[in-house]
Amino acid sequence: MGMRFILGRSGTNKSEVILKEIKQKISTNPIGPSIFYIVPDQMTFQQEVALFSDSETNGSIRAQIVSFSRLAWRVLQETGGGTKQFISSVGIQMMLRKIIEEKQGDWNAFQKALKKQGFLGQLETMLTELKRYEITPDDLRMQQSHLTDFVHQSPSEQGLTRKLSDLIYIYETFIYALQGTYVDSEDQLQLLIQQIKQSSILNNADIYIDGFHSFTPQEQSVLTELMKTSNSITVALTLDDPWKEDASELDLFYQPSQTYHVLKQLAWEAGVPVEDPIILDTLEGNFQNRPYFAHMEKYFDSRPAPAYEGEVPIEIFEAVHPRAEVEGIAQQVLELIRDNRYRYRDIALLIRQPEVYHDLIETIFNDYELPVFIDEKRPMLHHPLIELIRSILEVVQGNWRNDAIFRVLKTGLIPSADDEFPLTMDSIDQLENYVIEFGIRSRHQWIGENKWKYQRFRGFDSSAQTDRERELQESMNRYRDQVISAIATVDEQLRAATTVKDLCIAMYQWLEELKIPDQLEVTRKYYDDQGLPEKGREQEQVWDAVIQLFDEMVEIAGEEKMDLSVFQVALDAGIETLQFSHVPPSMDHIIVGTIDRSRMSNIRCAFLLGVNEGIWPMKPTSDGMIDEAERLLLEQNGLKLADTSERQLLDDWFYMYLAFTVAKDRLKISYLLSDEEGKAKMPSQLIHRVEELFPATKNHILLQDPEDESNTRRFVSTELKSRSALTAQLAKFKKGYPIDPIWWEVYQWYVEHHPQGGTTHRVLQGLHYENKPESLQKDTVEQLYPKRIQASVSRLETYYRCSYQHFAKYSLNLEERRTYKLDAPDIGQLFHEALKKITEWIHAEGNDFSALTKSQSSHYANRAVTELSPVLQHQILHSSNRYAYIQKKLEEVIARATFVLGEQARLSHFSPVGLELGFGDGNNQIPSLSMLLENGYELVLRGRIDRVDKAELENNLYLRIIDYKSSSKGLDLTEVYYGIALQMLAYLDVVLTHSEKWLGQQADPAGVLYFHVHNPMISAKGSMTEADIEEELFKQYKMQGLLLSNEEIVKMMDSSLETGSSQIVPAALKKNGGFYSYSKIADQSTFETLQNHIHQLLKSAGIDITNGSVDVNPYQHKQQKACTYCPFHSVCQFDPVLEENNYRKFADIKENDLLQLFEREGENNG
């Protein structure tokens, strides 16, 4: 019969004509010559359904629906050409890697690119393109020779010449490596071309070709051979005018028109007659009795075009972001199914950005209980088995890095080997917390002989291990043993392996030891039981794919020497190519596809998603090995490669046309106002085109979230989604906004059909929830707090910062995950302990602090840090070179502070009487400060004071408190007033209260001071002598705080002070006596008033805590907020937007006014 064409524009039912003809042939002669219906891969399933689903042709041994690759497999199976080993993408890339590594000499163009990630992938794509377009190394060599003949080569021509030189070498070597043994996907078609003549099933067969718009040269060669052996070839093309031989490149049908004329030419050259084409009428296809769609199809690419007046079943939607878009479309689909009697298979969603829409559609449509099939292969990359393989290689390669180890464990594929301490997800989390806190970061630390120790750093004088720590130590070591048992063997084998075969065997044996096939089978059964057969099938596919990958690597490069790092890269490249093959889970489902890949028919309603500028049509990328200019240069010299980006963009317009004309009954188009990151997006020009053709579509419908949607009835859908929408609507009502009456009917339905105590009841009850914690019941308080509460002053400061912060930290004992790092509190403890020891050593050695030299200060600092660093935070200062440097800098800070303290001591008549002075515990010199509370509880304060100094004046004893701080700090009386700075004055109160028993004499307050331990930097405007520098540095250590307003006492703190400002304390004396106003001073009665105020705050906090008071009441003072560094925000959920959540804002009160407040408070309490 020869060749014939079935031609017609979109919607003319070309496929139906072919199917009808095939059915007729099967019916007439069921066992006649073969019929092959060749379609693209993604079209085979739906055409099989279309051909064999009716009762007349529910099966056939004569007709087969195949793709080109499936036809090749079928023919090679018959003729014996299928004996060669198939090589996949990973095998090709391994072969290319080997070719590159074995090349002698330099490269002309690829030298820098060879080591870049993705180069092998680009190279593979280039070779595939060359094969697909039947370009041989000789063809490239001719192009290179032609370019070399140019006397004056442009830079582009020079670059292309060098690329061709490298490419010829690689291509020739690659073909030689494949020859006789391997075959890739492109070679399969080449073998098919060679074997068609020997195939009996193709002899005298009827061939039908559908769903293609163009063919590669290789596919054209297949068709040429089919023409010579088959009885007939029928090709369906989307084309309007077959007689137009010189169609413009801007013509909508340029691509299929070129295809039509190329196939005619091939038939003529093969001596095959070509029948007159069958041209189908647009008005007799899908658009019969649908003039609006006929108008769309006819004028889609015509300008000017008449407008279609009147209402049309075409709607344009806009959405604020992709989630709102998909949510709105799911509601539209549900409405079509529920109210318009559509079947799921009547509906299609067409997209351009799978990475944006696939997960959203799958999740949201599942919520709406809408069966959906996404016509796209999914990568296996995120399957637990793949994660296990990739992570174990990172473990070995990264010397047992923690993140890699725990990725291995969290796959759930490492079995427990200890019944008493099983390796569950909870225990894995505990183990992870341990290794992060204790700095376990290497293979040596994991597999070393020493047992892990569990003992937290709680200060330099707290060294005993608790019972709980001993229990945790036992469990951590038992978990560790199981990890070592699971990983150590494969680690050793992978390190010892030298060839690809050894590496693959080590991996395979490890997976078998873990019984991965059995574990995957259990997972498959679980998914089958859950009604998720697709997920079940994935378990089989992923194991088969991994084994095939290992087999291929061994087959291609088994004896090749390969480092583990190179093997890891090669295996990763192979893994990235692995994909799940899915078939539709049912005959009735919504189809989701991309417009350039999917082939759809019999679609009643089509949704086009994300119709935005730059996406519809899509700007093509041009990042290949041969760029755009070089492709044009080759084409001008007669070598045709794949289309340029300009041609791709023009062809994309043809795919737009197909998408906009695919539906029979309804077309719904949506575009985004912003992307998932909130960036503004513009609608595609196609939106304006539709508005021009159909003025009735200009009023766009906004797809919004439930709480903003005016048409709320659309949200009455499934039980799950309706409950979510109902909650949003009732929340609006609660805020005073009107809602649609239908929601009260929905609410009543849930009340009647869902039991109390169930999920729905709890969700609706949540509408009445206020973020206000309830006070603790009496029995709870008694369980949390003993009758005699021992508390530090900082704990009570926390209470005044925020009651809930105190509750979370001290009552519930919540804490952040501890990490192996040196925090500010750790540095502060080091400073305190170092300065204490240095002072003790100086006194013990009979030296005078005031006579200390810089050299001595440095010596003492080095001695202190050397002694303390092994105890500090699990020896963190010994863990790395970085921390060794930090240790050196900390020594310098301590040395400088020690020297300055000596200089201050030389000018002071105050001397230390207590260092790191503890109070409140039985072994301490000073008893606790105890307060009986009115509710029967006793508040017992305990703590540790950095330093207490004493001096005597006129037979009176004066005490001052000095606190060492690693950051600059002063005494803010506002903070004292509100209770968030109690510590210094409380400590002063403690030592004054117990001074007679402690020191044998009742003492008076001299002041409270903060000493900033640091190594300051100074800025100089001009040259400075060493003495000037020392003087400026000394000023930087001026202490801040509050002093007794007694000139003699202040002079005893700075004997050099006669008039002016002191360089040691925050006071300044006038010439004629008295203090300057900026001095930080208070008289004796004020100190007593402050002492009384502190007492009241401490008692008040104790009463509130023991009464069970818990409030979310963080303070705010200027720019400071209790929430800023609070780790418990995820627990309290404080939100100032909520009516019930407000900051306690501290008034900004002047210091004099504060002192008056303190005095009035003292009078009232007195």
Swiss-Prot record:
Q: Which residues are recorded as binding [4Fe-4S] cluster?
A: 802, 1123, 1126, 1132
Q: Which residues bind ATP?
A: 8-15
Superkingdom in the source lineage: Bacteria
Any GO BP = double-strand break repair via homologous recombination
In the Enzyme Commission scheme, what number(s) does this protein have?
A: 3.1.-.-
Span-the-membrane segments of this chain are none
What does the UniProt cofactor note say? Binds 1 [4Fe-4S] cluster.
Enzyme class (EC, first level): hydrolase
Does this entry carry the keyword RNA-binding?
Answer: no
Domain (UvrD-like helicase C-terminal): give its ranges: 283-588
Report the InterPro entries cross-referenced here: ADDB_N (IPR049035), DNA_helicase_suAddB (IPR014140), DNA_helicase_UvrD-like_C (IPR014017), P-loop_NTPase (IPR027417), PDDEXK-like_dom_sf (IPR011604), PDDEXK_AddAB-type (IPR038726)
| Cofactor(s) needed | Mg(2+); [4Fe-4S] cluster
Query: Sorted alphabetically, which keywords does the UniProt record give?
Result: 4Fe-4S, ATP-binding, DNA damage, DNA repair, DNA-binding, Exonuclease, Helicase, Hydrolase, Iron, Iron-sulfur, Metal-binding, Nuclease, Nucleotide-binding
* GO molecular function annotations of the record: 4 iron, 4 sulfur cluster binding; 5'-3' exonuclease activity; ATP binding; double-stranded DNA binding; helicase activity; metal ion binding
Residue ranges annotated for the UvrD-like helicase ATP-binding domain, each copy included: 1-290
Residue stretches in coiled coil: none
Question: What more is known?
Answer: Despite having conserved helicase domains, this subunit does not have helicase activity.
> Which NCBIfam families has this protein been placed in?
addB_Gpos
Query: To which protein family does this belong?
Result: Belongs to the helicase family. AddB/RexB type 1 subfamily.
How is the subunit organization of this protein annotated in UniProt?
Answer: Heterodimer of AddA and AddB.
Give the protein's function: The heterodimer acts as both an ATP-dependent DNA helicase and an ATP-dependent, dual-direction single-stranded exonuclease. Recognizes the chi site generating a DNA molecule suitable for the initiation of homologous recombination. The AddB subunit has 5' -> 3' nuclease activity but not helicase activity.
HAMAP family xref list:
AddB_type1
What name has this protein been given in UniProt?
ATP-dependent helicase/deoxyribonuclease subunit B
Q: Which gene encodes it?
A: addB
